Amino acid sequence: MTTTVPFVTCDLLDDHTDKDIQVLTPSLDGRFFKSYGARKIFSGQIVTVKCFEDNSRVKELLATDGTGKVLVVDGGASMRCALMGDMIAESAVKYHWDGVVIYGCIRDVDALAELDLGIHALAAIPQKSNRQGIGEVGVNLYFGGVTFQAGCYIYADNNGIIVSKQKLID
């Protein structure tokens, strides 16, 4: 089990006004990130993957050591299929990932709610994705008004998601 130091994103913003911290904003079309995992507060160093309706790279990455890391997935906000379900999420727990943020959908909602993993996604859908081995790892991502770069730090709770180039907590 990975341990995250308790924090509140609001307080991190208030306490670090001298740092360049980005705040993920809800989109004008009403898309909001929702928490699906049992872990409601999570943080870590960002690992990025860009994929559209193909979770091959997500599955591969979450089967590697994720200690102190959060996978950020740009799924193009697709509402047609899920990029993570219970089996991939169980792998993430097994390999000590702190969390996963998906700009797209997940599935197996009830099973995910039981896992000690931070999970934020736009929505749930029962349809699984195609696996064709397509996706880019380690690329800069941009959604919700935030640029996600591999190696930066992400902090998520029920208030929202923030990103910083510097580590804000130990």
UniProtKB/Swiss-Prot annotation:
GO MF annotations in UniProt: 4-hydroxy-4-methyl-2-oxoglutarate aldolase activity; metal ion binding; oxaloacetate decarboxylase activity; ribonuclease inhibitor activity
InterPro entries: RraA, RraA/RraA-like, RraA/RraA-like_sf
CDD domains: RraA_family
Protein name: Putative 4-hydroxy-4-methyl-2-oxoglutarate aldolase
Annotated EC: 4.1.3.17, 4.1.1.112
Lineage of source species: Bacteria, Pseudomonadati, Pseudomonadota, Gammaproteobacteria, Moraxellales
Subunit structure: Homotrimer.
Top EC group: lyase
Alphabetical GO biological process terms: regulation of RNA metabolic process
Origin superkingdom: Bacteria
Binding-site positions, substrate: G85, D86, M87, I88, R107
NCBIfam families documented for this protein: NOT-MenG (TIGR01935), PRK09372.1 (NF006875), PRK12487.1 (NF009134)
Catalytic activity: 4-hydroxy-4-methyl-2-oxoglutarate = 2 pyruvate; oxaloacetate + H(+) = pyruvate + CO2
SUPFAM superfamilies hit by this protein: RraA-like
Note on cofactor: Divalent metal cation.
Annotated binding of a divalent metal cation, by residue: D108
Naturally occurring in which organism (per UniProt): Acinetobacter baylyi (strain ATCC 33305 / BD413 / ADP1)
Entry-linked Pfam families: RraA-like
Stated family: Belongs to the class II aldolase/RraA-like family.
The keyword Transcription appears for this protein: no
Keyword field: Lyase, Metal-binding
Cofactor entry: a divalent metal cation
Function: Catalyzes the aldol cleavage of 4-hydroxy-4-methyl-2-oxoglutarate (HMG) into 2 molecules of pyruvate. Also contains a secondary oxaloacetate (OAA) decarboxylase activity due to the common pyruvate enolate transition state formed following C-C bond cleavage in the retro-aldol and decarboxylation reactions.
